[in-house]
């Protein structure tokens, strides 16, 4: 069977279905007796400006020290992609993301940095934190 271009345009794609059905899920921390830090970069975050409707692009940097749960990476990807068509301010989306991550995983400490691409010659970086960071001797 040959699919026509119109059929493809009207069809909900598998990625869209996964994003729509996705939810933040966690798994047990495999090293609960050790303090360690997880860093995740998400360089292709998008949402829409609630005032203009234009797309906003950002790099998200998530760092956290897990408590009893670790957030599953594919779930993070699908969750963050769900903002692609939402009209939401930089400040609101950054705070919503960390609130949702904290609610599902209850980390010891978490920081989210949202580095939005400049628009109109204005560059916005928003940082939000939760909890108290344990001092780790990390060097690479």
Swiss-Prot record:
GO terms for biological process: queuosine biosynthetic process; tRNA modification. It holds the Pfam family QueF. Gene3D superfamilies: 3.30.1130.10. Substrate binds at residues 71-73, 90-91. One of its GO terms (cellular component) is cytoplasm. Pathway: tRNA modification; tRNA-queuosine biosynthesis. InterPro entries: GTP-CH-I_C/QueF, NADPH_dep_7-cyano-7-deazaG_red, QueF, QueF_type1. It catalyses: 7-aminomethyl-7-carbaguanine + 2 NADP(+) = 7-cyano-7-deazaguanine + 2 NADPH + 3 H(+). GO terms for molecular function: preQ1 synthase activity. Its EC number is 1.7.1.13. The active site is at 49 (thioimide intermediate), 56 (proton donor). The keyword Iron-sulfur does not apply. Keywords: Cytoplasm, NADP, Oxidoreductase, Queuosine biosynthesis. It is an enzyme of class 1 (oxidoreductase). It is found in: Cytoplasm. HAMAP family: QueF_type1. Belongs to the GTP cyclohydrolase I family. QueF type 1 subfamily. Catalyzes the NADPH-dependent reduction of 7-cyano-7-deazaguanine (preQ0) to 7-aminomethyl-7-deazaguanine (preQ1). This is NADPH-dependent 7-cyano-7-deazaguanine reductase. It comes from Prochlorococcus marinus (strain NATL2A).
